[in-house]
Structures are given as structure tokens and as C-alpha cells.
Amino acid sequence: MKYQLVFIGFGEAAYNISLGLASEGFTNMAAYDAFMDDPQRGKLIHQRAEEAKVPLISLEACAEGRFIASMNSAKVAVSVASGIIPQLKSGQVYVDLNSASPTVEEEIDKIPRAEGVRFCDAGVMGTYLTRSEIFLQQQQMPRQKDIRKDDS
């Protein structure tokens, strides 16, 4: 894979998440945003991408990510997923981070895909700028795998 993480949609959430990941040493990211060439919205998208050191790529190039994080709108979640998931290969993970209903997520999960392509419905609980310590249990679990390293 060319990128470890690709964002589809580079608005406020993806921008802040990319800053947080970069601060932890995770830098192999790229992003696509449908409005990146828009005369009004595009300037901010390009400024944020430059600041976060996240290259902006084509929608087609998003299929070159190990993890593809969809962070656009619940209204377009299925159509975006339908355009990307069928192109993915074994070992890639499509993560839907939109605030979509369970019915929409089930529809995305039913999109035909190659064997070994994974789908994850995930939620966003704040951003890097509003981060806080979260304690889920009394003792820290050993880390299973460092996703910053490409072992595919």
C-alpha cells in the first residue's frame, strides 16, 4: 500500500485527527475531499492539508490506502463506499466514521468486496484539540500491533 491511512473528506475532524496522529509519529497519510478544488471551500482544505503535511490525492488514489477512513457525510456514505470498496484488495480496511444510521452501515457492509477486505463502522469522540485521557480499565493492555508499521 502506498499510504497507511487515507481520509475521504478532509474537514475539521479529519484535519484534527491527522494532526494528532502526526504528533505521535504517524505520518503516512493522504486525503481526498470533494470540495478541494471548490473556489470557496478549497482554500481552507489546501491550507489544512499543507499544515498537517497530508497530501491531497484523487478519489481513485484513495484505493491505495491500507486504512480508508470515510469522513464526509451520512448522506453520501453509501455512494462513496460503493465507489471505493469494490476496488480494494485483501488486507485493506474501509472505516466509515460518518454519523450514519445502523441501516446505512448495514448497507455499506453488504457492498460486494474482495475476500480479506474488512469494513469497520466507527465513531468519532472529539478531536486532537479536545483530547483527554480515557481510562477503559485498571491495567494497560499490551499493544497487539503497531499500525504505523507496514507488515503487509
Q: Whereabouts are the PLM-identified features?
A:
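A short helix->loop->beta-strand "cap" motif at the edges of active sites that frequently abuts
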Residues: F26, K89-Q92, E115-V117
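NAD(P)+-binding Rossmann beta1-loop-alpha1 motif at the extreme N-terminus of oxidoreductases
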Residues: M1-A63, Q87, Y128
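Rossmann-fold dinucleotide-binding core
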Residues: A77, A100-S101, E106-S152
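Rossmann-like NAD(P)-binding element
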Residues: V54-T103
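Short glycine-aspartate micro-motif
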Residues: L5-F7, Y94, F119
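Hydrophobic residues in well-ordered beta-strands that form the structural core
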Residues: A31, S58, D96, F119-D121
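Short loop or secondary-structure boundary microenvironments that flank
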Residues: G11, F35, A74, N98-S101, ...
